[in-house]
Amino acid sequence: AANGAQKFADDDSILAIGGSCLTSCTAAMLPITGDAEMPQLVVSSSAKSLTGISDYFFRMAVQDAAVGPQIANQFTKMGKTKAVTLYCNNDYGSGLKDSFNAQFEANGGQVLDSVPYQATDQDFAAILTTVKSLDPDCIALCGTTTDGALIIKQARQMGIEAPIMGQPGLYSQNVIDIAGDASEGLLCSGVFVAAGADEKGQEFVTKYGEKYSGEVPDGFAALAYDQMYVLADAAERAMKENGGELTRQTLAEALKATEYEGVTGTVTFDDNGDWVRDYLTLTVKDGKYVLYEE
C-alpha cells in the first residue's frame, strides 16, 4: 500500500486517491499522501485511529466508534440487558467490541463475556458453546461478512435464539447465501438499503442491476458510487473557483466544503475529514434486507 501511494504521489497527473479498503493499508498510505498534499477519500477504512493522521484525509466510511454504540443503543431500545460480544481478533473487531461494550454498559446493560475468534476460523462450535451456556438476550457480532455469516448459521443450528446484530459488512447477499434461513431476523448497521432507497437511490439500484446481471447493491457499492460523485463534484467546484485550473490543494479545499446529496445521504465532512452522520438499522425479512421497524 505504501509503495502504491508513493507511486501515485510522485505522479503529478494524479490529483486524488479513492481508497484504500482496509484500515491497515490506509494507515500506511496516509503519511505519504499527506506529505504530497494529495486528497485521499475512503469508504471502508473505519478505525478511529486514522483520524488526524493527514489534513488531506476524507472518510465516508461507517466508523467503528459510532457503529458500536449504535448496536448497543438498538439492543437497549429492544429491552435487552445481557449481551455477549463475539469479535474477530484484529484491530477492526477489537475496536468495534470496545465501543459496543462501553456504550452497552453505559446504558445499564451487562456484558457477560467478550469472546474472540480468528478471521480464518470456520468452525465456531467451541465459542458458541460458551455463548449458549451464558444465555444472553442479545449478541453483538464484531467481524466481517464471511465469518459473520458462518457464526449466524452455526449459532441457530445450536439453538441459540438471541437476536444478533453486527456491522455494515453483514449487509451482503453473501450472508444470506451462506447462512440461509438462519439469516432471518439478523440485524446490522448500515447507510443504505435497496428496499428503502429514495428515488435517486432506486435509480442507482436499477442501473446497478442492469450492469451486474440483476445483483442488488449493498452499502459498500452505494458508498463507492457516491465516492466518485463526491470527488467529481469537488473537482467541478474547484475548477469553477480557480479559472478552470485544478490542483491537489484546490481539490482538497473543495472537498472540505462538500455538501453532496448522494444515494447514501447528504455527504459533508467535519474538521477531521470525517462524515458524521446517523446510521440505519437493517434486518433480514423474508430473505431480503429491509429497514428495521421497531
Give the predicted meaning of each segment.
Residues 1-294:
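Extracytosolic ligand-binding ectodomains
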